């Protein structure tokens, strides 16, 4: 079994976070790869985006490491949904490299995000997920999230439209 360490991301992690975001978001052969196109932002722009997120703390980024290798990350902060109360947090993104799935890294990232949101005074948390991403749905439901059926919506992602739904839970 691998040793899993989570820690706040540093600027040096921006490249790894960008690589994970581009690679883990669309692993070949998954339902997500069938509905989600490759990210419109190229790698260089992804790296700049994540470097700025890490530098300015919006969202807060934690990474999961196997020894010295960054294998996953979570971005979390206050909820961005219009009209949400200040006590509502949000998982903005959570990704683990496919080679590290089912080894506890996703759970460790969720634990780090939950602890961070509690420190910020949040009492609830939400996450938006593509309906077709059965693996992510299952992960979040096992972590105690419940679907909000009335929240289902279609959003543009690159050149396609993706059906997504919000899940929530108490912290």
Predicted stretch roles:
Residues 2, 161-171:
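Terminal substrate-recognition subdomain of acyl/acetyltransferases
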Residues 117-129:
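Conserved GNAT acetyl-CoA-binding A-motif
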Residues 97-99, 103, 131-132:
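Active-site acidic-Proline motif in GNAT/NAT acetyltransferases
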Residues 104, 121, 144:
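Short glycine-rich hinge loops at helix-strand junctions in the catalytic core
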Residues 4, 8-14, 18-99, 107-112, ...:
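Acetyl-CoA-dependent GNAT
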Residues 136:
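Helix-turn-helix
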Residues 126-129, 141, 146-163:
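Conserved catalytic-core motifs of GNAT/GCN5-like acyltransferases
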């Amino acid at each position: 079994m691998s040793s899993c360490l989570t820690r706040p991301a540093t600027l040096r992690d921006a490249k790894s976070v960008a690589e994970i975001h581009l690679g883990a978001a669309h692993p070949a052969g998954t339902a997500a790869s069938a509905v989600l196109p490759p990210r419109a932002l190229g790698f260089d722009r992804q790296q700049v985006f994540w470097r700025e997120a890490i530098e300015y703390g919006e969202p807060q980024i934690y990474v999961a490491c196997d020894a010295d290798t960054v294998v996953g990350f979570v971005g979390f902060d206050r909820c961005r949904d219009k009209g949400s109360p200040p006590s509502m947090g949000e998982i903005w993104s959570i990704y683990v490299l496919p080679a590290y799935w089912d080894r506890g890294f996703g759970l460790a990232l969720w634990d780090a995000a939950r602890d961070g949101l509690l420190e910020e005074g949040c009492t609830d948390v939400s996450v938006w997920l593509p309906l077709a991403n059965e693996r992510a749905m299952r992960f979040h439901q096992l972590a105690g999230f419940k679907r909000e059926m009335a929240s289902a919506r279609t959003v543009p992602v690159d050149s396609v439209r993706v059906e997504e739904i919000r899940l929530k839970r108490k912290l």
